Amino acid sequence: MTVEYAAPMKFFSFWRSLASFRVRIALNLKGLPSDVIFVDLDANAHRTDAYRNVNPQMALPALVWDDGTTLFQSLAIIEYLDETHPSPPLLPADARGRARVRALALMVACEGHPLLTPRVRRYLDHELNLRDTQQQAWRRHWTVETLAAIEAHLAGDKATARFCHGDTPTLADICLVGHVHAAVTQQIDLAPYPTVKRIFETAMALPAFAKAHPLAQPDTPEAMRGKAG
């Protein structure tokens, strides 16, 4: 398949961004180089005019080519990469398999993760004046609810194997590991979710996943390095 954009990609990323984590995994699995531009969310670099010109939503990640073409939203970026660089495939060959993988991915990317993002936490803090303990309870509730739902789907489906769907990583695994990382950072016990835990550990043993880990990035704070697990 002909690649639409052969020029080097600029990848706007941040070490702690789970959406950026997903795209890093996909780039690694595909063996695709990119010019990484770090956007410090903690310093509100995503809210500057410079980044607003890249992505008016002021969210990460974004892929930009020299001709000005910009892609945003992690799942759209990953599907583009999969269509233009089909090996290894991140979606199954059959329509039902693709629908299942997308559904699992969407459970995380469109239902679980949005409730944990910095802009939601900022609203809970600045607009609703929730205490730290209340905000922690919020994050924990939605993280656990998503884990439980995914576990039920994975454990009850014969299509689940070494990974979420079959024996090779798919878009579903790319999304799953980020959500589990969010659970680990909250010290949530994964014992009630054995299928999720097994797949997470299997995926993170692969170099493409391990090298994409939030705690293993060039912009990861030095104090956080080496804590990836």
Q: Language-model segments: which ranges?
A:
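Active-site-flanking alpha-helical
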Residues: 82, 179-180, 213
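Generic structural signal for helix capping and beta-alpha/helix-loop junctions
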Residues: 44, 200, 220-221
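Acidic/histidine-enriched, glycine/proline-rich intrinsically disordered or flexible terminal extensions
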Residues: 216-229
